[in-house]
Amino acid sequence: MKSLDQLVFDNRFARLGDAFSTQVLPDPIADPRLVVASEAAMALLDLDPAQADLPVFAELFSGHKLWEEADPRAMVYSGHQFGSYNPRLGDGRGLLLGEVVNDAGEHWDLHLKGAGQTPYSRMGDGRAVLRSSIREFLASEALHALGIPSSRALCVIGSSATVWRETRETAAMLLRLAHSHVRFGHFEYFYYTQQPEQQRLLIDHVLEQHYPECREAEQPYLAMFRTIVERNAELIARWQAYGFCHGVMNTDNMSILGITFDFGPYAFLDDFDANFICNHSDDRGRYSYANQVPIAHWNLSALAQALTTVIEVEPLKEALGLFLPLYQAHYLDLMRRRLGLTTAEDDDMALVERLLQRMQSGGVDYTLFFRKLGERPVAEALKVVRDDFVDLAGFDAWGVEYLARCEREPGNAEGRRERMQAVNPLYVLRNYLAQKAIEAAEAGDYSEVRRLHQVLSRPFEEQPGMQAYAERPPEWGKHLEISCSS
C-alpha cells in the first residue's frame, strides 16, 4: 500500500489545453479536520488506510497542500437544466486536481469539491457545505455497495469556516473519484459554441481513454455512442429497481461513463410512490421517480444532437432506439432476481407491474417488502408482508399468482432465500438517517456519519446491533424533499 506522497499522476485531461479547462489553485478552508474517509475508495488508489489519520491527509484534501505533479483545473461545460439550455456552466466550486494511476494501470480523477471560486462560479462563493458533502459521500459509497455504478467518495474534510446558504452552514470539502468527469454537457458546450475542432478532440479523448474497445469498429464514434446508451440503460434500470431517485437529471449531471454522478437532492423510496419527487425545487415533477426513464432518454438525445458533427443523424436515432428495450430487459432481470425468480416467463413483467400497483395504493415500504419476502418460504412470507397492504383482496390475488410462479421455479426454499438476500438490501440510505448523521456532524460529532457509512457498505448482510438502520422511517422522515443548495 502507498503513502500519499507516492501517488503517481498522469493528467491526461489537462493536456487537452485551455479550451477545455482553466488552471485554478484550491482556496484552503480554515482548520481542516477529517469527518469521514472510505477505506474502499482509498484502496482504488492503493492508499494505506492509515494515511487518513495523518495531518497531511486533511491538508491535501482541504487545499492547504498540493502535490507537485497535480495540475488543478476547473472544467468548462454547458447543459440543459430542467429542459432549458444554459450555455455556460462549468466547475463553479470543484477542481480536477489531477489523475492518479494505480498499480493496476487505472486512471482515477481526484476532484475536490468546495475548493473555492473559479471562472465558472457565476455569483457563487465556490464553497461546499458539510451537509451536502456528507450526503454525496454517503450516497456514492452506498450506491457502489448496492451494485449501482457511481462516482466514488474518498473523504469529507470539515472546517471551522462558515458560509451562507438558506442559513449559515459549516464549510467542507469532498474528494470525489471517477475514471472521468466528462459530462454530456461538455459535448453540448463545444457543439453550441461551434468549436468543431475542440469537439473532435474531446470525442477522440473519450474514445481513446474510456471506450478503447470501440476504436476497431467500422464507425468508432457511433459504437461509442451506442455503448453510452447501453450503459445508461443499465444504470437507470438499477436506479428504478432499487428505488433510487436522483433529483436533478440535468445533462450537466450526466456522466459520459454511465455512472451516477453529482449527488444533490436524491432519495431512496420509503413507501413506494411512482410519482415521488425528492427535489423541492422540482415543482412540476420533471425528475420524479417515474420520469427518470424518459428523462434519461431525453438526455441521451441531447448528447446525440451534440454529436451530429461527427455522426450521421439516422444512425444516432437507431442507437437511441436501443435505450428503452435495453432498459426494460435490464430492469426485468433485476426485478426477477428481487422476486427470487431464476427463469423467465412471458408474464413476468405484468407480475411486477401488478405488484407495484398494489404497493402504490397501500403505502408499502419498498425496500423492506422485498427483504421480508425472501426471509421465509413463499406461502409464509406472503402472510407476513400481507399486513403492510391496504388492499388485502388485491394483494391476495397477486400472492396467488406469485406463489404459482414460484412453484414453477427449480431449486429449494433455502436456495431461494440465499438468492433473494443477496440482491435485496436490508439497509439503504434513507434521507432521515442521513439527516440525523448530518445534524450530529454539524455539532462536531462525526461518529454517526462513520457508523452509517460502515453499515451501508454491507447493505445485504444483517449486522448485529444495527437494527435501527433497517426500520421503517418515522412519519417525519418519510418523503423528505431536499434542497438543491450545496
Swiss-Prot record:
ATP binds at residues 90, 92-93, 113, 125-126, 176, 183, 262. Mg(2+) binds at residues 253, 262. The keyword Membrane does not apply. It is an enzyme of class 2 (transferase). It comes from the Bacteria. Nucleotidyltransferase involved in the post-translational modification of proteins. It can catalyze the addition of adenosine monophosphate (AMP) or uridine monophosphate (UMP) to a protein, resulting in modifications known as AMPylation and UMPylation. NCBIfam families: PRK00029.1, PrtAdtaseSelOPseudom. Belongs to the SELO family. This is Protein nucleotidyltransferase YdiU. It comes from Pseudomonas entomophila (strain L48).
